[in-house]
Curated annotation (Swiss-Prot):
PANTHER family: HTH-TYPE TRANSCRIPTIONAL REGULATOR, HTH-TYPE TRANSCRIPTIONAL REGULATOR GLTR. One of its GO terms (biological process) is regulation of DNA-templated transcription. This is HTH-type transcriptional regulator CzcR. GO terms for molecular function: DNA-binding transcription factor activity; transcription cis-regulatory region binding. Keywords: DNA-binding, Transcription, Transcription regulation. Residues 18-37 bind DNA. It comes from Bacillus cereus (strain ATCC 14579 / DSM 31 / CCUG 7414 / JCM 2152 / NBRC 15305 / NCIMB 9373 / NCTC 2599 / NRRL B-3711). The lineage of its organism: Bacteria, Bacillati, Bacillota, Bacilli, Bacillales. Coiled coil: none annotated. Belongs to the LysR transcriptional regulatory family. It holds the Pfam family LysR_substrate. It comes from the Bacteria.
Length: 288
């Protein structure tokens, strides 16, 4: 069993097919197929179910994936320990929720100071970003917080005011029972705040419509499709143009914090250390 066998196994498990894994690894398909078969023979157990749509892990394959992911992560960290230079460089894989208003400033400041670092940015919802940080798929992520998890450390980024957004200038709380709610999928911090508020008020929304893109939600509100709850900074341009109206909500639900998270046990590269310093400096400036 060689390291590349584990890399091939992980790629097939992630991609769900030999062809996609071969493309990702720049291998010929026959080589990938042979390596997987050899691995199964060596372990004396099938690791994948083969079907027309591709390949999915068996129960033993899922067990194997846990160990392989840890081994490959340890190998990556070993390389980082010996290859990490004093000058930040390499790739930082960062996740973020869509409405971090301070993100452009943080990224711009970091890039100007450390141009040798390649920043790979991935958007997502808070819950899925936490999962990807825990699974070592991301080096860190900006999420709605704070959170409590034994494997995660967090750094304050900003606190923003949440506003109820409607097309009409006037709003009455009873409208929640007659007007659709436009929200992100489950796992969004803003949605959680809104649902908690409605539950406490004993209100049942007429309909919940889920979206993946912030601009789609805001433009739909502007067209009268429904109402939503987002940070005030995210809707400033539409509010200023008079296309939507912002309404304050009870203080208990009216703000949300953004934090940056990373695994406590992951190796701290100079690139990550300098990124955290940039976040800290920016947070300090905002607090002045």
């Amino acid at each position: 069993m060689e390291l590349r066998d584990l890399q091939i196994f992980k790629s097939v498990a992630d991609q769900g097919s030999v062809s996609s894994a071969a493309k990702e690894l720049n291998y010929v398909q026959s080589n990938v197929t042979a390596r997987i078969k050899q691995l199964e023979n060596e372990l004396k157990t099938p690791l994948f179910y083969r079907h027309k749509r591709g390949m999915t892990l068996t129960a033993e394959g899922r067990k194997m994936l846990v160990y392989v992911s840890k081994i490959l992560q340890d190998v990556d960290e070993l390389k980082q320990v010996f290859l990490d230079s004093e000058t930040p460089s390499g790739i930082l894989k960062i996740g973020t929720v869509e409405t971090v208003s301070t993100l452009p400033t943080i990224l711009s400041s970091y890039y100007k100071s450390y141009p040798n670092v390649d920043l790979s940015l991935q958007a997502g919802l808070t819950e899925e970003l936490i999962r990807e940080v825990l699974d070592h798929q991301l080096d860190g992520a900006f999420i709605s917080g704070p959170i409590k998890h034994p494997l995660i450390e967090q750094y304050d980024v900003s606190t923003e005011k949440l506003m109820l957004i409607t097309q009409n200038k006037a709003f009455h709380i009873e409208e929640f029972t007659t007007t659709p709610l436009l929200v992100f999928n489950q796992g969004c911090g803003y949605r959680s705040k809104l649902e908690r508020w409605l539950k406490d008020e004993g209100l049942l929304p007429k309909r919940i419509m889920e979206f993946n893109i912030l601009e789609t939600i805001l433009n739909s509100v502007a067209l009268g499709l429904g109402i939503t709850l987002v940070p005030q900074s995210a809707v400033h341009h539409l509010s200023k143009a008079g296309k939507v109206h912002c309404h304050a909500i009870p203080e208990k639900y009216g703000s949300i914090s953004t934090v940056f998270i990373r695994r406590k046990d992951s190796y701290m590269t100079n690139s990550m250390r300098s990124f955290l310093k940039t976040i800290e400096d920016h947070h300090h400036i905002n607090m002045l």
